[in-house]
C-alpha cells in the first residue's frame, strides 16, 4: 500500500517529504493551500486537527513531522538514515529529533504569526521580536555542535539533520537567517544542496 502524505509548501510537512525522497520510498503527495483548515475545510474530515503533515500508511495515521521521519526509518528499515539504541550517539540523535520542533520550531511559529500572518490590527511586533530572539538563543547548542562537524550524528546524514534542517530553512524563509552564525548557515547550505532536498523542493 502506498504511503500518502498531505503537505503545504514550506510547512513542517517538508520534513517527512524530504525524508521520503532521501529514502527512495514510493508515496502519493497531496499538496494543500495553507492553512488547510481555513482553505480546504473538507480536509478536516481526514484530519480533525487541520494541520500538516498528515500521513497515512495502511492503518497508521500520523500528524507529527519528526515522528513520521522516525517511523519511516524503523518501519522501512532505512537504518542508514537513523541510529540504533546500541549506538553511543543514540541519545543525542533522539535529542536532536525532539529539539527540532519543541525547542526551535515553536518560537518560529509565534514569530511568524504575530509578526507576519495576522492582520495589521492584530500584529504584535514586540511579541514577534521576543520570539525571534528566543529562537536565535535556542540555536546556541547547534552553533557549538556543528563547528567541527559536517552532520549532527555519527559523521553522516540522518533524519536528525532533516528535523533540524527544516527549522533552519524555515528561519531563512521568514527572514531570521540573517542572524545565523557562519557555521550554521554553512550547515544549512550543505543540507539544501542534497539531491533529496532538491527533489522535495521541486514537488512543492
What is each stretch, according to the model?
Residues 33, 159, 204:
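Short, solvent-exposed turn/loop segments enriched in Gly/Ser/Thr/Pro and often Arg
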Residues 85, 199-204:
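Short, flexible loop/turn segments with low-complexity composition
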Residues 73, 167-168, 201:
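Active-site-flanking alpha-helical
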Residues 45, 193, 202:
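Phosphate-coordinating loops and pocket residues in cytosolic domains that bind phosphorylated ligands
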Residues 97-193:
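GST-like fold's C-terminal all-alpha helical module
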Amino acid at each position: 500500500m502506498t504511503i500518502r502524505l498531505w503537505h503545504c509548501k514550506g510547512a513542517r510537512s517538508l520534513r517527512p517529504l524530504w525524508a521520503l525522497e532521501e529514502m527512495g520510498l514510493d508515496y502519493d503527495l497531496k499538496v494543500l493551500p495553507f492553512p488547510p483548515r481555513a482553505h480546504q475545510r473538507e480536509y478536516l474530515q481526514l484530519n480533525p486537527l487541520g494541520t500538516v503533515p498528515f500521513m497515512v500508511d495502511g492503518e497508521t495515521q500520523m500528524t507529527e513531522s519528526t515522528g513520521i521521519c522516525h517511523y519511516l526509518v524503523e518501519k522501512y528499515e532505512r537504518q542508514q538514515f537513523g541510529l540504533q539504541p546500541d549506538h553511543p550517539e543514540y541519545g543525542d540523535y533522539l535529542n536532536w529529533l525532539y529539539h527540532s520542533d519543541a525547542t526551535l520550531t515553536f518560537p518560529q511559529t509565534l514569530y511568524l504569526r504575530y509578526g507576519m500572518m495576522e492582520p495589521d490590527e492584530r500584529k504584535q511586533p514586540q511579541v514577534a521580536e521576543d520570539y525571534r530572539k528566543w529562537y536565535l538563543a535556542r540555536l546556541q547548542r547547534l552553533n557549538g555542535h556543528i563547528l567541527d562537524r559536517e552532520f549532527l550524528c555519527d559523521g553522516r546524514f540522518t533524519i536528525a539533520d532533516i528535523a533540524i534542517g527544516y527549522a533552519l530553512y524555515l528561519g531563512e524563509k521568514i527572514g531570521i537567517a540573517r542572524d545565523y552564525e557562519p557555521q550554521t548557515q554553512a550547515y544549512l547550505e550543505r543540507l539544501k544542496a542534497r539531491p533529496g532536498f532538491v527533489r522535495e523542493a521541486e514537488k512543492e
